[in-house]
């Protein structure tokens, strides 16, 4: 009876931890970036959920390996994963900032993928520096102007999921294993992912609705785009410096 009660408490804690984990700084920045460059709320929601799905996939694979085989990523992986996330956020933030200076930031024929955004962001920086130092090219170079596929959005979610394996999270899963076996540990993992998906889905819906509501209000849209870019660049820089752990908790 005691073990059964403790198991239920462990599963509930895993679900709550997943819900809280969904409200991390990098999730807010990434989902906001995705929403800010889409022309329709449905596209913002779809691409946001692709990112969320990639993140959840990484959590599922790493969590299952830890539970079933007691395998986890080496401690050093946290450092390079944190910096990799920082790079994606800084480059995407700079790209979103570029849309702030364009007359029609949402005039895409098709939503652009995350890798397309990363490449075009770097090309835009290169073009802008060239213009400052005497370059004559009028139009910024771009690749895949109309966007191709959705796999890159999913891939960036996978990258961002590499930093999700926390000691507290693993301790809960292993506690569930001790109380109810491997099956209970996997159930704890599923409840964690369910909490994560719930929070991130709410975030995607909120971001999609917010940006969609500003499409007919140019000043509000440009202000929101500027704030999104600034937030992404600042958070990305913090991650690049390896200081994400010093950020205050958003959930208390």
Predicted regions and their residues:
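Alpha-helical multi-pass membrane helix bundles of inner-membrane/thylakoid proteins
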Residues: 2, 100-161, 219, 247-252
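Juxtamembrane transmembrane-helix termini in multi-pass membrane transport proteins
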Residues: 6-75, 170-187, 205, 210-211
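Divalent metal-coordination and catalytic microenvironments
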Residues: 24-27, 55, 90, 165, ...
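Select subsegments of transmembrane alpha-helices in polytopic membrane proteins
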Residues: 50-60, 154-164, 224-232
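Transmembrane-helix boundary and interhelical-loop signature of multi-pass inner-membrane proteins
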Residues: 63-88, 98-105, 175-186, 190-193, ...
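Active-site-proximal loop/helix segments of hydrolase catalytic cores
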Residues: 151-177
